[in-house]
Amino acid sequence: MIETLKERVNGDAALVRRGRYLTTTFLLEIGPAAWLISIFEGRIVSVTSGPFVMPSSSFALRAPEEEWTKFWSRRPPPGSNDLMALIKRRVLKAEGNLQIFMANLRYFKEALAKLRNDGAAA
């Protein structure tokens, strides 16, 4: 499923435009599975699956697989419908240079919501 993130995000011109000043690599952990996602000027250029020995990323988003499953459901329940709600419930850990994450929060919310069963934005 994560493999489709590149085509889903890059296929949304409005989302790419929103992230036009964003160039970074971040780590997404879904339970024991890890993914390095590289973004250049709002376009996802690579989605690489782990495991990684020493991953180089600006920041990391880590949550159990069951929490991501709820987040990516067609109609996520309250508390699982938004990245900040997951952080507030302390099930999503955001670590590293959070300035990049917070400055582009809407981009990351919409990009990760593209993996929902219906592909809707956040």
Report each predicted region and the residues it spans.
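Feature captures hydrophobic
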Residues: M1-A122
